[in-house]
Amino acid sequence: MAEDLINSFMTGPDEQGRFGIFGGRFVSETLMPLILDLEAEYERAKDDASFWAEMDDLWKHYVGRPSPLYFAPRLTEELGGAKIYLKREELNHTGSHKINNVLGQILLARRMGKTRIIAETGAGQHGVATATVCARFGLKCIVYMGAHDVERQAPNVFRMRLLGAEVVPVTSGRGTLKDAMNDALRDWVTNVRDTFYCIGTVAGPHPYPAMVRDFQCIIGRETRRQLAEQEGEGRLPDSVVAAIGGGSNAMGLFHPFLDEPSVRIIGVEAGGKGVDERMQHCASLTGGRPGVLHGNRTYLLQDGEGQILEGHSISAGLDYPGIGPEHAWLKEQGRAEYVSVTDDEALAAFQTLCRLEGIIPALEPSHALAHVVKIAPDLPRDHIMVVNLSGRGDKDIFTVAKHLGVDIRT
């Protein structure tokens, strides 16, 4: 078993930013000094009590943490099996988990004297969080967003502009998250002096995957404490479930439980129109293979010649042809399991949570909920399952209405 081979699943990455064969730093000579400076500053910040004191204060008074751990009674009753808890990250300021990480990176940018912040965004949640924190600290903010995502996430585009950010539509490729990240990296190369790149997920060159994970681990740490308060001292969840695009919300929930062998860890990818040879999905762990993209080695959707494929998902935040390298490593080690659900299954789960709990989830966590709907009925009633509700669904109502054949624009 994997547990017999490794003393801890929580010690990575190594000094080169690698999780086994995954991760690393595959960047241009122009960017390497910036990457090394960022790593050095983060290592200093990790040991600086004042840095974490400021983070804790902002998490509490600005973000509104801790986010609730909510027992979902009607969903549990409807499914008739596992006891389901929702980690309510959608109740954070800006409506998702993204601000947990953005706060940390912007504080690092200020320590480094950077005055111009760039970011990529898919669903718009990371862009909104970045624009929000830049407004809080008076920093210039430029957000790259695929033109296709600009269209399907119009409410978040308006929010970013209200917050003072410049939103740059990216028309290359299919106009989605991969293309936005490409253009953000090009910007960074040409504006190295004053610019900080705030990456929104556990991907990219080292130290980003580890750094973003560390900032998001507040999710799992709170979950451990809150579940013990509600279910009894020492009680751990039997399973934790989260949707995965790049994988930051999932890693934030998973990481504090990696060394607890009794906790089943399940990541849910975007199966789109089905994981088959058409590649109309974004399930890189389920239907991809290892390669290099955006500065790290990981599982990717690619053709026989190694060209990156576009993929598809109804969810803009999961519409990415790769995955964070730590997830790739956990898959290889057998510590976490990764599955996929289709667009239609996610839409059904979206409606189920609205109807049963009065909570409108984003389409991203609706994928995790869809898998819960599949497996919870077959689990015993004392099985505790925690689902990361990583974002709220206000941004998705137009997309959902369109797929349901409802016109809400008139």
Swiss-Prot record:
Pathway: Amino-acid biosynthesis; L-tryptophan biosynthesis; L-tryptophan from chorismate: step 5/5
Keywords: Amino-acid biosynthesis, Aromatic amino acid biosynthesis, Lyase, Pyridoxal phosphate, Tryptophan biosynthesis
EC category: lyase
A molecular-function term among this protein's GO annotations: tryptophan synthase activity
Swiss-Prot/TrEMBL catalytic activity: (1S,2R)-1-C-(indol-3-yl)glycerol 3-phosphate + L-serine = D-glyceraldehyde 3-phosphate + L-tryptophan + H2O
Domain of life of the source: Bacteria
Cellular component, GO annotation: cytoplasm
InterPro entries, A to Z: Trp_synth_b_CS (IPR006653), Trp_synth_beta (IPR006654), Trp_synth_beta/beta-like (IPR023026), TrpB-like_PALP (IPR001926), TrpB-like_PALP_sf (IPR036052)
Residues forming coiled coils: none
Record flagged with keyword rRNA processing: no
EC code: 4.2.1.20
Pfam families referenced in this protein's UniProt entry, alphabetically: PALP
Record PTM N6-(pyridoxal phosphate)lysine, positions in chain: 98
Residues that span the membrane, as ranges: none
Annotated S-S bridges: none
Needed co-factor(s): pyridoxal 5'-phosphate
Family indicated by similarity: Belongs to the TrpB family.
Subunit record text: Tetramer of two alpha and two beta chains.
Role this protein plays: The beta subunit is responsible for the synthesis of L-tryptophan from indole and L-serine.
NCBIfam families given in the database record: trpB (TIGR00263)
Protein name per UniProt: Tryptophan synthase beta chain
Provenance organism: Paracoccus denitrificans (strain Pd 1222)
